[in-house]
């Protein structure tokens, strides 16, 4: 079974989503299906078909989350050290073209959220950063052309 590296908070978020789906979404959709069934002929009952479609989505997401959680390999970034970029690191970068400073944490695929500053370990940027140190420059392929970043600092925890 493939292991999914992730941080503790990432695992907690997935577990919370799973609990929510099982305790709130699943019972609500079962009630919605029962209500739609009470309206009679199911062949032309849009509410029923919509509820069944939603149920299928919810059950699929539950199965996906259960698989991810069972294969999670939690890595605690606070136990890591050094100045080399690796999983869990907070990396301060400067975009060499715009001089804009950004900080990203390298996290697992299932917890990445660019708006929150968390990038997937499998993203082009993270792949180019892994193994590098402050002062190194990396070039990352982007839709508008390659972008260059200088690593300013690497932190853990």
Curated annotation (Swiss-Prot):
Disulfide bonds: none annotated. InterPro entries: GreA/GreB_C_sf, TF_GreA/GreB_CS, Tscrpt_elong_fac_GreA, Tscrpt_elong_fac_GreA/B, Tscrpt_elong_fac_GreA/B_C, Tscrpt_elong_fac_GreA/B_fam, Tscrpt_elong_fac_GreA/B_N, Tscrpt_elong_fac_GreA/B_N_sf. GO terms for biological process: DNA-templated transcription elongation; regulation of DNA-templated transcription elongation. NCBIfam families: greA, PRK00226.1-2, PRK00226.1-4, PRK00226.1-5. It holds the Pfam family GreA_GreB_N. The keyword Transmembrane helix does not apply. Transmembrane segments: none annotated. Keywords: Coiled coil, DNA-binding, Transcription, Transcription regulation. This is Transcription elongation factor GreA.
């Amino acid at each position: 079974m493939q292991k999914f590296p992730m941080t503790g908070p990432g695992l907690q978020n997935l577990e919370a989503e799973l609990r929510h789906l099982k305790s709130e979404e699943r019972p609500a959709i079962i009630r919605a299906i029962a209500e739609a069934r009470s309206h009679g002929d199911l062949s032309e009952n849009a509410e029923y078909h919509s509820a069944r479609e939603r149920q299928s989505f919810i059950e699929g997401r539950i199965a996906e989350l259960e698989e991810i959680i069972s294969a999670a390999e939690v890595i605690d970034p606070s136990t890591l050290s050094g100045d080399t970029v690796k999983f869990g690191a907070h990396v301060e970068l400067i975009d060499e073209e715009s001089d804009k400073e950004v900080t990203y944490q390298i996290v697992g695929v299932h917890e990445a959220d660019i708006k929150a500053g968390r990038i997937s370990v499998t993203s082009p940027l993270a792949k180019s950063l892994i193994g590098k140190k402050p002062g190194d420059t990396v070039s990352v392929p982007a839709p508008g052309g390659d972008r260059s970043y200088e690593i300013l600092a690497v932190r853990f925890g």
